[in-house]
Each structure stands twice: as structure tokens, then as C-alpha cells.
Amino acid sequence: MRLSTATLLLLLASCLSPGHGILEAHYTNLKCRCSGVISTVVGLNIIDRIQVTPPGNGCPKTEVVIWTKMKKVICVNPRAKWLQRLLRHVQSKSLSSTPQAPVSKRRAA
């Protein structure tokens, strides 16, 4: 009888212990899209789409995924200087090309 009680308590304790940190410590988290990244420059003429995914949803790192026009997926190092310049350029283009909302003039009463 004692053996089954001890086994039951051990099973209960293992169910209540946090396991989230253990998986991240051993890098066994499979929710990241990129298993490896490159830092070499990707030609602008072959880029179809860029996606930047911040840490979260089970992946502890920022990921930058580039889809080429040939439907190839490339994971790029988010700290690569050429990529940082490209993202700043794209962001400034999108901000400058956004039309401004119309402003209605009100008369003072």
C-alpha cells in the first residue's frame, strides 16, 4: 500500500512541476520557423515578400523570413546590417506613400 501511495505522490508532483523552462533551456522548442539563418545579402530583385516575426508563440527569438519570386523560403539573421537598412528603407517608403486623412475645417462658434 505504501508503494502505491508514494508512486501516486510522485506522479502528482511531476504533473504539477513547470516544464516550460526545461524545453527552452534545451532548445527542443519546435515552434520556431527557422532552424538556421543566413547573413549574406539577398538580391532585391528576387524578394517577393518579407515577414518579421517577434519573439512569442513558443519561439524565443525574432525571425525574419524572406520569400523569393521563385517560391523559395530564406531565413535571414535579423541582426544583419544589410537587412536592417532594407527594413528601414521599406518602412520609410510605406510611411511616405500612405495618403493623409482628409482634414475638415471647423468654424469657431
Swiss-Prot record:
The keyword Signal applies. GO terms for molecular function: CCR10 chemokine receptor binding; chemokine activity; CXCR3 chemokine receptor binding; CXCR5 chemokine receptor binding; fibroblast growth factor binding; heparin binding; receptor ligand activity. Found in spleen (B-cell-rich zone or follicles), Peyer patches (strongest within germinal centers and extending to the mantle zone) and lymph nodes (in reticular pattern in follicles). It is found in: Secreted. InterPro entries: Chemokine_b/g/d, Chemokine_CXC, Chemokine_CXC_CS, Chemokine_IL8-like_dom, CXC_Chemokine_domain, Interleukin_8-like_sf. Belongs to the intercrine alpha (chemokine CxC) family. This is C-X-C motif chemokine 13. It comes from Mus musculus (Mouse).
